């Protein structure tokens, strides 16, 4: 997430600095380091080395932007790998149904043979999102349903729906969510980027000695050196998973947009930095991305569930503090930070259409909520479905990705009157368990289940 902070050089308490993670970042996300047969060469639907969100991670866990030529080469390699393979649904489907029992059978067969799971299985039959979860007691199955499509490789190497261009759901993200959901009861699923305490102290000391603002670039460079690399923290999911890569990459891309390091591509979403007025105050805004849902609808027998109203919202640090009952920050910069968050929230879906990593984040949130629903309502037990083949880490190893650990600090900002506007950090966080606490009864959800189960084919793991 992006954060920029307005700070007056004479006014920088350590706590304020910590709350609004200083200095802008330039990242480069890494490649996957370990491959497992069932999930292909390094996972990601069997597509080889990953570059989630256009970033890469080196052997030391340091993030950087991926070279555009490397992205183009990766896209071409993926097209070659997928040539002639089944990719998602056979054309656009408004309500694609996917059998988890048959998905599990396909995975077990691949593990037994030491072969790769078919790409259409790894992409959950081309699902773009999950709208329904159905319990099928007769077939001892759980059925996921939502819009589906055939898959194509886009210009940046992402596996996306042919019609909408949205990234497809990935089986490996669902497995990570199912495995991690119990531990996520405390703290949710999240990532953040923080300066070290030592770096904050060093930056404080440096700013306390600044007497002249004449050479801004020199000051920025010294700030970078004083603060040092920022630390990446991932919680609630394994840091070496694709799921974690998505959290970090979305956070990073949002920061770059807010900092003005790359355009959003949307007229209605300028950088936060460009919006801050002169003399805006000394508050240090920090931005977070969170998820919201409408109450989950269910039938009276709790055999059919409908997810709706999912959206990602941008919040300032003071919004989060207010929610916790703590004092909010004050000042004009807080109002501008809030306004930028409102614009980010308003244009999130449009941004996701331009930068797929934001759609991937929404996909991961959906799958985490599905995992929480299955666990909290014991849906697998109700169906008589054994999920252990997916949950058994010893028998089904997932791809291992480079663990993002640090971001080189790049101080970037502008002078506003006698004050500096600098970049700061934030994070991505959501609590999937919160979304399954409140449900509403809706008769039409049960009708959808009846139609879906009646059309189940004798063979195949997905159907319309």
Where are the language model's segments positioned?
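Outer membrane pore-forming secretion/assembly proteins and partners of Gram-negative envelopes
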Residues: 39-464
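Bacterial N-terminal signal peptides
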Residues: 19-34
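N-terminal secretory signal peptides that target proteins for export/translocation
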Residues: 1-19
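Serine/proline-rich low-complexity intrinsically disordered segments, especially terminal tails, linkers
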Residues: 5, 12, 30-36
């Amino acid at each position: 997430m992006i954060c920029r902070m307005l700070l007056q050089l004479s006014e920088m308490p350590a706590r304020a600095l910590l709350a609004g993670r200083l200095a802008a970042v330039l990242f480069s996300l890494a490649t996957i380091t370990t491959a497992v047969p069932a999930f292909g060469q390094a996972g990601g639907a069997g597509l080889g080395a990953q570059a989630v969100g256009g970033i890469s991670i080196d052997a030391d866990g340091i993030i950087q932007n991926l070279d555009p030529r490397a992205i183009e080469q990766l896209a071409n390699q993926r097209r070659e790998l997928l040539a002639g393979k089944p990719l998602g649904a056979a054309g656009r489907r408004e309500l694609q149904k996917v059998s988890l029992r048959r998905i599990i059978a396909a995975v077990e067969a691949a593990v037994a043979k030491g072969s790769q799971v078919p790409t259409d299985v790894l992409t959950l039959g081309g699902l773009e999102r999950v709208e329904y979860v159905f319990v099928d007691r007769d077939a001892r199955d759980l059925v996921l349903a939502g819009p589906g499509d055939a898959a194509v490789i886009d210009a940046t190497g992402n596996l996306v729906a042919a019609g909408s261009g949205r990234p497809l759901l990935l089986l490996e993200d669902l497995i990570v969510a199912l495995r991690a959901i119990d531990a996520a009861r405390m703290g949710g699923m999240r990532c953040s980027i923080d300066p070290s305490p030592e770096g904050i102290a060093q930056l404080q000391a440096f700013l306390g000695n600044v007497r002249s603002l004449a050479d801004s670039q020199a000051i920025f460079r010294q700030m970078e050196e004083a603060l040092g690399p920022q630390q990446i923290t991932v919680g609630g999911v394994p840091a070496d998973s694709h799921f974690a890569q998505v959290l970090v990459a979305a956070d990073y891309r949002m920061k770059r947009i807010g900092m003005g390091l790359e355009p959003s591509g949307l007229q209605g979403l300028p950088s936060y930095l460009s919006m801050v007025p002169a003399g805006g105050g000394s508050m240090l805004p920090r931005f977070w991305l969170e998820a919201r849902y409408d109450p989950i609808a269910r039938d009276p027998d709790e055999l059919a569930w409908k997810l709706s109203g999912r959206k990602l919202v941008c919040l300032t640090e003071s919004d989060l503090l207010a929610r916790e009952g703590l004092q909010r920050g004050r000042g004009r910069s807080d109002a501008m930070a809030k306004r930028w968050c409102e614009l980010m929230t308003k244009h999130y879906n449009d941004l996701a259409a331009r930068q797929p990593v934001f759609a991937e984040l929404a996909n991961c949130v959906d799958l985490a909520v599905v995992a929480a629903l299955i666990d909290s309502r014991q849906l697998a037990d109700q169906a008589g479905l054994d999920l252990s083949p997916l949950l058994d880490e010893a028998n089904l190893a997932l791809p291992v990705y480079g663990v993002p650990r640090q971001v080189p600090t790049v101080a970037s900002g502008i002078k506003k009157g006698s004050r500096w506007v600098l970049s700061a950090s934030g994070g991505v966080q959501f609590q999937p368990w919160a979304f399954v606490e409140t449900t509403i009864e809706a008769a039409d959800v049960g009708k959808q289940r009846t139609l879906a189960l009646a059309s189940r084919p004798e063979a195949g793991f997905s159907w319309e």
